Amino acid sequence: MFSFFTANQANDALPDVIKKFEYALAKKNEITKIEKQLQVCVSTTNSFKEYMILKQQLNSAITKFYQSIEILESTGVMIKSIEQGLLDFPSKRFDEKVCLCWKHGETEIKFWHEKDSGFMGRKPIEVNDESLI
C-alpha cells in the first residue's frame, strides 16, 4: 500500500530497508558473477553440461533478484539505482510531492529533493523541518 513518509517514519523504517536493499544488492552481484562465469564457459569450453548448469543458476539468481526487488519495494521506497545505492522515500513538503533520499552507506535520512530533481538536487533536512509531512 502506498503512503507518504515523514522524515521520522523514513528513519524508523531505514534499518529494515537497508537490510532488504543489501540483500537485493547481493542478488544483483550474484547475477554479475554468474554472467562472467557463463562468458568464460562459452569462450573456453565446449561443455554443454557446464553451460546448462550455469544457465540454470543464472535463471534462479535473476528470479531471486526480482523477488528481492519486490520485497524492497513493498516497504514503500522507490528504487532509483541498485548499482549506485539510491533509494527515495515518497514525502510531501507543504503540498508538493518530494522525496526523502538515501544513499547506500548513510545511516539516516538527512536529505530531500524535489520529485524531478534527483540526487543532484539533494537538500539537507533542517532539524525542525515541519514542512515535510
Predicted regions and their residues:
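Short secondary-structure junctions and interdomain/linker hinges
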Residues: 24, 28, 45, 76-79
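Structured domain cores in non-transmembrane regions
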Residues: 34-61, 66
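Long, hydrophobic N-terminal alpha-helical segment
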Residues: 1-41
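Short, charge-rich amphipathic segments
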Residues: 1-8, 62, 126-133
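Glycine-rich, aromatic-bearing surface loops/beta-hairpins
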Residues: 71-133
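Generic alpha-helical propensity signal that fires on short helical segments
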Residues: 19-30, 35, 49, 56, ...
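A structural signal for well-ordered alpha-helices, especially hydrophobic packing surfaces
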Residues: 21, 28, 62-65, 69
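A generic "functional-site adjacency" signal
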Residues: 3-4, 66, 94
